[in-house]
C-alpha cells in the first residue's frame, strides 16, 4: 500500500537510450523520457531552460556548422575561379 511496498520494487522501467545514452528509455512505452527517441525531433521544453542549454547547438563539436558563417560571407565559393572579364 504505502512505504513498505515500495521496497519490493526491483524491476527496471527504464533502460539505456540509443540516442542520448541516458537510462531514460521506457521499456514498455518504447520511448525515451529524456530525448524523446524514437521521435525524429529531439525532446525539448521551454519550461526546462537549463536542460535546453545543456544540449542545444554549440555544446558539441559543430564539425560542420562552425565553418558555415565564414563560407556564407564569401558566398559559398566552390573552388572554381571566376571567369575573367576584360576591363574596358
From Swiss-Prot:
The keyword Translocase does not apply. Belongs to the eukaryotic ribosomal protein eL37 family. InterPro entries: Ribosomal_eL37, Ribosomal_eL37/eL43, Ribosomal_eL37_CS, Ribosomal_zn-bd. GO terms for biological process: translation. PANTHER family: 60S RIBOSOMAL PROTEIN L37, RIBOSOMAL PROTEIN L37. This is Large ribosomal subunit protein eL37. Binds 1 zinc ion per subunit. Its cofactor is Zn(2+). Keywords: Metal-binding, Ribonucleoprotein, Ribosomal protein, RNA-binding, rRNA-binding, Zinc, Zinc-finger. Pfam families: Ribosomal_L37e. PROSITE patterns: RIBOSOMAL_L37E. GO terms for cellular component: cytosolic large ribosomal subunit. One of its GO terms (molecular function) is rRNA binding. Binds to the 23S rRNA. A zinc finger (C4-type) spans 17-35. Zn(2+) binds at residues 17, 20, 32, 35.
